Amino acid sequence: MVECLTGKKILIKGNYAIANAAVLAGCQCYFGYPITPQSEIGEFMSGKMQELGRSYVSAESELAAINMTIGACATGAKAMSSSSSCAIALMQEALSYAASDELPVVLISVMRGGPGLGNIYSSQGDYFQTTKGGGNGDYKLIALAPSTVQECVDLTYKAFYLAHKYKNPTVLLADGLLGQMMEPVEFKPYPYPEIDNSEWALTGAKGRKSRIIRSYAPLADEQCVFLEKLFNKYKQIEENETEWEEIGTEDADIVLVSFGSTFRNIKTAAKICRQKGLKVGVFRPITLYPFPHKRLNELADRVKKFISVEVNMGQMINDIKLSVDGKVPVELIHKPVGAPPAPEDIAAQVEELA
C-alpha cells in the first residue's frame, strides 16, 4: 500500500499516483470493479478511503460501480470510479444519464487493447469512446489526457475541479503504459477552489423545497430547451477550458500531433528530424474534449503538413482533419497496440512523408 503524502516527491506508479491524487482532491466516495491495467487504483482506495473514514465499495459489476457513483454525485459528494476499455463500454448508458442529469462524475479510464475483450497491453484505442460518446443522445464528456505520471496527478486534481465547476462527467484518459509506469512525482496540495453545490445537491428537503434530478423530458419542447441549455454549457467549456502544448511550431513545416504517453516519443523524434534538417514541431491536446480545433486551424495557415501519431488504427486524426479543414495534408503514423512507436521509427517515417 502506498502512503498518501502531500508536499513530498516520491517514485510512484501511475495508477497509485492517480488514486493518491483523488484522495488529496477530496474524493469522498469510490466505487470500482477490478480490471487490468487499472486495478491498483481500486487496491489503493480500498485501504486509504476506509482509513480516512470515507466510502469505498467494491461493486458487483462495472454497471453497478458507475451507477453508484452517479448516486453519490447526486448528493453533491466528490465521487469517482475507475475502469478500462471493454469495461468502460459497459458504463456508456450511465455516462449518458450522468451528462443529462448534469452530475460531477469523475471517471478514470486506463486504456487497454480492443475491440471486444482485446488484451491487457497499452493502447489509445478509446479516443472515440471518450470523445464521441458511446451512450445515446447529444452530450459531451470533458476529457483530459496526461502524458507523464506527474500529469496523472495534476489532471486528476483538475478532473475533480472541472466536473464540479460545470456539473459534467469528466474523464481522465490515460493509456495503460502510464498506469504501469513509475516516475518521480510531487504531490502538491489540491490547488483549486471548492465549488458550492448547495443549490442543487440532494441533501434532504427539510427546511427547503424538494429537488428533482432527472433526465426524462416527456415533452419535445421541454427537451429542446434542455439541450440548448446543455450545449450553451459546452460552449463555455470550449471557450474557457481548451488546453494544449506545442513545441517548435513557430518555424515548423511539419507538425507531429499526439496525446498521452506517445507525446514523449514525438518530442524526441522531432529533435532527430531537426538534426537532419527537417523543420518539425510537436503539438499535444491536453483536453481531448474540448479539442483545440481553433489553434490547429491557425497553425494550418503556415505549416505544410500535420502527422498524427497514435497507438490505435487512427482516431484522433479525424479531429485533426476537421480542425485543419483541408488547408494542408494530414498523415498518420501508428501502432495498433502496445508501446508507442520508437522515436527513431517515427523520425524515419516523417522523412518518408516529408
Question: How should these model regions be labeled?
Answer:
Residues 1-133, 140, 148, 336, ...:
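Thiamine diphosphate
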Residues 13-17, 231-254, 267, 271:
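Glycine-/acidic-rich phosphate or pyrophosphate-binding loops and their flanking alpha/beta elements
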Residues 83, 106-110, 144-146, 171-175, ...:
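Short beta-strand segments
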Residues 122-175, 342:
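Conserved thiamine diphosphate
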Residues 167-246:
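Conformationally flexible catalytic loops at phosphate/diphosphate-handling active centers
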Residues 266-299:
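Generic long, charged, amphipathic alpha-helical segments
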Residues 310-354:
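Peripheral docking tails and interdomain loops at the edges
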